[in-house]
Amino acid sequence: MELSQKEIGLDRSKDDNGLSSNDYVVLGIHYPIDSDDDKVVELANKRSNSAGGSIGMFQQFFNKVEEFDYHPGFLSDVISRIHFTYRTKFIPIARSDDGPSPLRINFLIGDNPFNAIENAIYNPNCFNTDIGWGCMIRTGQSLLANAIQIAILGREFRVNDGDVNEQERKIISWFMDTPDEPFSLHNFVKKGCELSSKKPGEWFGPAATSRSIQSLVEQFPDCGIDRCIVSVSSADIFKDEINDIFKNKRYSNILLLMGVKLGVDKVNEYYLKDIRKILESRYSVGISGGRPSSSLYFFGYQDDTLLYFDPHKPQPSTIESLLETCHTDNFDKINISDMDPSMLIGVLLQGEDDWQSWSNEVFDSKIINILNSRNDVTIAEDSMSLEETLEPPDNEYVDLGPMSQQLNGSP
């Protein structure tokens, strides 16, 4: 049996924009598959024939071939994204009297047993790791760090092994796990307690994460982001609020954080194309979400496969480890249909021109809604108050997408 390029994922068909449907996309930048198609097809057919013509066997082979054939520009871009993970042995965070215990088994099993025993003996009432509860905070940190990196260094910035960028080192140090750093886990937890009633050791959702980011950004103007606008229950963005910011400073850097739930148990097919469009936008800084109580940081896609960094790998909480591990080419993939419907979408607007361009870009979005003002939001056939709709708990998102489309006159 002879296999075609289409069967093995090398079909160079074009989408509506004239771009290859097989391109890899990283935060708005397209990269072609960098491989010798004829050679890959030849090798694939040899493997397929020897396996009795199994396309499934071939696809496993192609996945391995593909690992060695990424476009160099794609790999450079991926490696330059910032990625944070679980950390161990950081400065202890005291537990709340009515909060989770640091000695819960699901926290302990993921840690080095010696670390777990040491903490149980010397700090039984403190957390010195975020294993089992901090993944949404870590992916929120990743989203924020990449937004800051772009705001300060530009989207074209790339990591160079032979040339350490001191400004980027400073950005990364802001996320070190110590109360003294502005975007540390400690300060996320502190804001989670103040703004979202989250106790140390409790899992954050998109709403708590976005509120913490907004408050921490406001307290640290040196981060390069002038304002952080949060929509915790939908992706509603209000023109009057954004326009007021640009009236005062035309070239403001605005980070938009939009919490959405695009289905019940899984993402509704109605939204799948728009998720790709969000990651394809040059204004995207990624999506935090993934699976129930298991957050991932999505930074790109290829076809129906999303590309992500997984924070669930514990590493020591030292500045040396942080600097060594925050850049990696070790990314994973998931089919878009397997994505959890609750997610936090990040968009960075660098000036009024970006705002106008992005507004036009999402005009027909099924997820993001640009409304004139909050007065345009009506809760038809719903007993919830406006305040409840705009500020739901993490597990009670309201999908206002179709309703807002009706307000905008969209089909």
Curated annotation (Swiss-Prot):
Top-rank lineage group of the source organism: Eukaryota
Taxonomic lineage: Eukaryota, Fungi, Dikarya, Ascomycota, Saccharomycotina
Statement: the UniProt record of this protein carries the keyword Transferase: no
Similarity comment: Belongs to the peptidase C54 family.
Protein name (database record): Probable cysteine protease ATG4
Pfam family, one: Peptidase_C54
Gene from which the chain derives: ATG4
Entry keyword Cell membrane: no
Catalytic machinery residues: 135, 310, 312
Entry's EC annotation: 3.4.22.-
Keywords: Autophagy, Cytoplasm, Hydrolase, Nucleus, Protease, Protein transport, Thiol protease, Transport
Assigned GO CC terms: cytosol; mitochondrion; nucleus; phagophore assembly site
Protein purpose: Cysteine protease that plays a key role in cytoplasm to vacuole transport (Cvt) and autophagy by mediating both proteolytic activation and delipidation of ATG8. Required for selective autophagic degradation of the nucleus (nucleophagy) as well as for mitophagy which contributes to regulate mitochondrial quantity and quality by eliminating the mitochondria to a basal level to fulfill cellular energy requirements and preventing excess ROS production. The protease activity is required for proteolytic activation of ATG8: cleaves the C-terminal amino acid of ATG8 to reveal a C-terminal glycine.
GO biological process, one term: cytoplasm to vacuole targeting by the Cvt pathway
Subcellular location: Cytoplasm; Nucleus; Preautophagosomal structure
InterPro entries in the record: Papain-like_cys_pep_sf, Peptidase_C54, Peptidase_C54_cat
Region of interest called Disordered, as start-end residue ranges on this chain: 390-411
